C-alpha cells in the first residue's frame, strides 16, 4: 500500500509541474477511470477539411503538423522541486475564426518513465481539466497513436469545447488539440480528425 501511495504522489508531482499546478488531491481511481468519447477523434467524416492548411515542420523540433496559418511559439521553463533542473515547455498555437489550434510539449526526465505511460497520460489529463476551473471532462480513452502511447480527450468550459490527444514519444509528452464553440462540434469534427492525423512525431 505504501508503494501505491508513493506512486500516486509522484504522479501528482509530475503533473503539477507539467501543467502549471492546482490545489487539491485525487483518489487512486481518478487516474485510471475512462469515459467513452462521444465521437472518434481519428475518423474523418464529411465536411470541410484541412486541405488548405500549411505544413509546419520546424528544423529545431521533432514533429511536423498542419496549421491553418503560421503559429505563434511560447516557451517556458518549469522548476523541478529539490532539483537544479527545469522542465522545458513549448507551445505552438494559432487561431482560425473561432477555433484555436495548438500543439504543445514538454520533455520529461528519463527516470520518470518508470511510472508507466498510462499513469503519466491519465494523470496529466486530470490536472489539465482540474486547472480549468469549471471545466467538465466529456470523455477520455487510452489509445495508440502511430505506435506511441496516447490518450484521447474532450472537455468543455462554458460555450467552448476542447478535443485532442496526448501522445508520449519516448520521454516527450505532446498535447495536440483544437478548441472551438460547443455548437460547432459537428462542423469541426472533420478538421479535428485530419489535424490530429497530420501530426507526425519522431524520437529525434
Label each residue range with its predicted role:
Residues 2-89, 96, 131-137, 142-145, ...:
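N-terminal targeting sequences that direct proteins away from the cytosol to non-cytosolic compartments
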Residues 147, 151-153:
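Extended beta-strand-rich segments in extracellular/periplasmic secretory proteins, especially
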